[in-house]
């Protein structure tokens, strides 16, 4: 389900948070489109935190600390990286107004970024919205192999450590399925979201201003509760 809003300049970060609490998020047709439209998918993408999968090859890359991973250090650069054309994704849904809104959410502590660096160059990352015990992954990018995957592993470790209950990916791609992403019907999603919004989580339970090693991130993921059957 979608609904177009031509008065996107009237939307505030606080209004955006209320939309997320209702299971709705904004997109744009293209970077040049001045308007937004609201989306509430019939089937919602999630990565169950207790079912997150890390391949052996990726685990070796994460453990090697070949990349330096930081948090909330270069938010604007990450959102710009996500908005830039990439192979297989020549266009973007991140227009100027979306950029402004999410920077606004970052400034009030409800949006976060994970940055991946190689030799002091930003080569990957992701950003998303934090509300209650829910984290809404918005977009990711990479300029080096596995950089966005490493960012996702570090994000999941941080969410687990911080007491999050829901990782919303909005949609499911083959890439996300390899990490355990699933689709759930809208009604089921709303039940999960409502439960996640009853309490608060701590994105900064792991330090924001100090590095977390790949080995530490993998240990946190390995220690998560066993999925219920």
Curated annotation (Swiss-Prot):
Chain's role: Functions in the N-end rule pathway of protein degradation where it conjugates Leu, Phe and, less efficiently, Met from aminoacyl-tRNAs to the N-termini of proteins containing an N-terminal arginine or lysine.
Superkingdom of origin: Bacteria
Reaction catalysed by this enzyme: N-terminal L-lysyl-[protein] + L-leucyl-tRNA(Leu) = N-terminal L-leucyl-L-lysyl-[protein] + tRNA(Leu) + H(+); N-terminal L-arginyl-[protein] + L-leucyl-tRNA(Leu) = N-terminal L-leucyl-L-arginyl-[protein] + tRNA(Leu) + H(+); L-phenylalanyl-tRNA(Phe) + an N-terminal L-alpha-aminoacyl-[protein] = an N-terminal L-phenylalanyl-L-alpha-aminoacyl-[protein] + tRNA(Phe)
Entries under Pfam families matching the protein: Leu_Phe_trans (PF03588)
Family, similarity comment: Belongs to the L/F-transferase family.
Protein name: Leucyl/phenylalanyl-tRNA--protein transferase
Name of the gene: aat
Biological processes annotated in GO: protein catabolic process
Cytoplasm recorded as keyword: yes
EC number in record: 2.3.2.6
InterPro entries named among the record's database cross-references: Acyl_CoA_acyltransferase (IPR016181), Leu/Phe-tRNA_Trfase (IPR004616), Leu/Phe-tRNA_Trfase_C (IPR042203), Leu/Phe-tRNA_Trfase_N (IPR042221)
GO MF, one annotated term: leucyl-tRNA--protein transferase activity
UniProt keyword list: Acyltransferase, Cytoplasm, Transferase
């Amino acid at each position: 389900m979608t609904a177009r809003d031509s008065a996107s300049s009237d939307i505030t970060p606080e209004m955006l948070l209320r939309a997320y609490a209702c299971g709705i998020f904004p997109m744009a047709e293209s970077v040049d489109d001045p308007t937004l439209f609201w989306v509430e998918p019939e089937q919602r993408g999630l990565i169950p935190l207790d079912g997150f999968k890390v391949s052996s090859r990726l685990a070796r890359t994460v453990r090697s600390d070949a990349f330096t991973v930081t948090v909330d250090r270069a938010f604007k650069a990450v959102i710009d990286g996500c908005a830039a054309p990439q192979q297989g994704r020549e266009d973007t849904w991140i227009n100027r107004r979306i950029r402004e809104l999410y920077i606004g959410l970052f400034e009030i502590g409800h949006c976060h970024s994970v940055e991946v660096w190689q030799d002091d160059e930003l080569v990957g990352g992701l950003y998303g919205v934090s509300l209650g015990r829910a984290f809404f992954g918005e977009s990711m990018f990479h300029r080096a192999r596995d950089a966005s995957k490493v960012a996702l592993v570090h994000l999941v470790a941080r969410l687990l450590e911080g007491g999050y209950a829901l990782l919303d990916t909005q949609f499911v791609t083959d890439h996300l399925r390899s990490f355990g992403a699933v689709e759930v019907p809208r009604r089921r999603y709303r039940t999960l979201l409502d439960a996640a919004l009853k309490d608060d989580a701590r994105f900064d339970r792991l330090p924001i201003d100090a590095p977390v090693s790949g080995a530490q991130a993998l240990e946190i993921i390995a220690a998560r509760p066993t999925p219920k059957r």
